[in-house]
């Protein structure tokens, strides 16, 4: 289990649990699931959906596809962003998405 000290003041423990193909509405993509704890007693899932169309749009501009490792890294950066921005994440079960609105910014954080 890994730890992340968030800007909200909470220290989260988390680990990668599962990756699977998924759909959100009319969009297809990949869902990354992390198991997270705030108190080291209760563990809850946090899901990050990486939109396939956003990845394709990026690929068209960059001339190459995102690797599986890069996509995983983007999902993890979105998880950290949620930790930093959302207080009480355990109760809110946010809909975390990587799409055209945030993919480039997340990749920039990774120097990609």
Task: Locate the predicted segments by residue.
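Short, charged/polar N-terminal "headpieces" of proteins
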Residues: 1-41
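Generic preference for hydrophobic/aromatic residues in regular secondary structure cores
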Residues: 16-17, 48, 79
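Amphipathic alpha-helical interaction modules
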Residues: 33-63
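Acidic, low-complexity intrinsically disordered segments
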Residues: 54-112
């Amino acid at each position: 289990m890994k730890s992340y000290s968030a800007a909200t003041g909470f220290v989260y423990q988390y680990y990668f649990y599962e990756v699977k193909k998924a759909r959100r509405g009319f969009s297809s993509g990949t869902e990354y699931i992390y198991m997270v704890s705030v108190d080291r007693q209760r563990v809850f899932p946090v899901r990050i959906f990486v939109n396939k169309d956003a990845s394709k749009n990026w690929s068209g501009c960059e001339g190459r596809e995102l690797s599986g490792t890069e996509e995983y890294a983007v999902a993890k950066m979105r998880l950290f962003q949620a930790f930093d921005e959302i207080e009480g994440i355990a109760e809110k079960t946010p809909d975390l998405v990587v799409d055209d609105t945030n993919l480039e910014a997340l990749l920039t954080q990774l120097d990609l």
